[in-house]
Amino acid sequence: MTTAPSPPPAVTSARILRLWWPLAASWLLMGAELLLFTVFVARMPDPEVNLAAYGSIVFPISLVIEAPIIMFLAMSTALVADGDAYAKLHRMMLKAGVLLTVVHVLVAFTPLYDLVAGRVLKVPVEVMEPARIGLRIMTPWTFAIAYRRFHQGILIRFEESRAVVVGTAVRLVANVAVLSVGFAVGGIAGIVVGTCAVATAVVVEAVYVGWRVQPVLRERVRPAPVHGAPLTRSAFLSFYVPLAMTPLMMLVIQPIGAGAMSRMPNALASLAAWPAVHGFVFILRSVGMAFNEVVVTLIGEPGAVRALRRFCFAATAVVTGLILLVAFTPLSAFWFGTVSGLAPELASVACTALLFAVLMPGYTFLQSWYQGALVHSRRTRAVTEAVAIYGVVAVSLLTLGARWQAHTGIYFAITTFTIGGILQTAWLWWRSRGPMRALGPDSDSVPAAEVAWNGTSPAE
């Protein structure tokens, strides 16, 4: 005699918090990695050039190359419900990781680098060679990210999110270990020590996550019956291609922003201060980014919409209050001058730049709320539309700023990103109204991955 499976527990604020906090902690630790880079490299020889090399070339180019696989986490969270889906998507992950690693090698080890960094981005000449070395060291980054995010999504889907934060803690320990050894040895360029730490840490985390997910695959994924129609290539592409275009378009703006700052007044200071400012803002934005997977996982369950909305708005108020507290008090000078170790002139630039970023953490939570509803409802094209709006606005304003030559680059760039982000959030809200109405405040819809696949997206 078989018994019906017990229904999932009600979606309450406590359940949302239990799923969200490990993911938020994981994102916070990733943000700490960016700050650690700044803290250590700022205390090594020639910090301004090495920080600029990482902030203007190494980090943004590495992100652009890996952009097509960034959404593997959301993909596996939504789609890996059984062994058949896992096998097909695992093969896709391996192929994408290898292909993008080849792209990274071509950019870092061939004359393509001179074209991208010198002719396209026009970064200061003193930054070119340190950044070339750093980009080469980052070669393992892309495949490790693909492997890690794919398996993290499976852990999140099956509510094993604490394993995700443990993996990120392992990554942070590896990062600190390499940075500490490099700093203690001395005489090694900051860009070399920093990128060795970042590359080593992400590989170590990928190995841990791959080991930790094995019991979930063995006991819960592979034995599970196929949900709905089998996952087909056309169904997958209709779901994932718009989703993958989202970070690609978003991250292409990063090197464009670096290129624009290189053409604006106070270029080297802007590029050198950028990693510290971006790292701090990323910490507060990261907890909002973690909310996206929570929404995708829970929004189809009864009562989820009301509970998730309430949680989102409360969290938005908290993170906005925190960044306002830092930006408009002496805490910003303490952070950038004492903690980050920036020289006084760079710390001053960073403190002023933070004032232009105060809306970013709040609208990141809102973006995750609206975007999660769209991903659950398979309306991923709307997510791409929102990012396209962001991209058009950002590129247009950055081009104007580079020609205008009236403001310090980092101030103009952050203002541009904020304006684009607000418009992106507004579009996500507009396009998510239909899915939100369909789900309703007390939705009894089935989880997203149980929707039958027919090779097409829902009506837009």
Predicted regions and their residues:
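Hydrophobic/aromatic residues in alpha-helical transmembrane segments
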Residues: 37, 72-76, 113, 151, ...
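Alpha-helical transmembrane segments and their helix-entry boundary regions
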Residues: 51-52, 89, 152-153, 161-165, ...
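Short alpha-helical transmembrane segments in multi-pass integral membrane proteins
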Residues: 2-23, 77-141, 181-241, 299-359, ...
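Small-residue-rich hydrophobic transmembrane alpha-helices
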Residues: 53-104, 148-152, 156, 273-323, ...
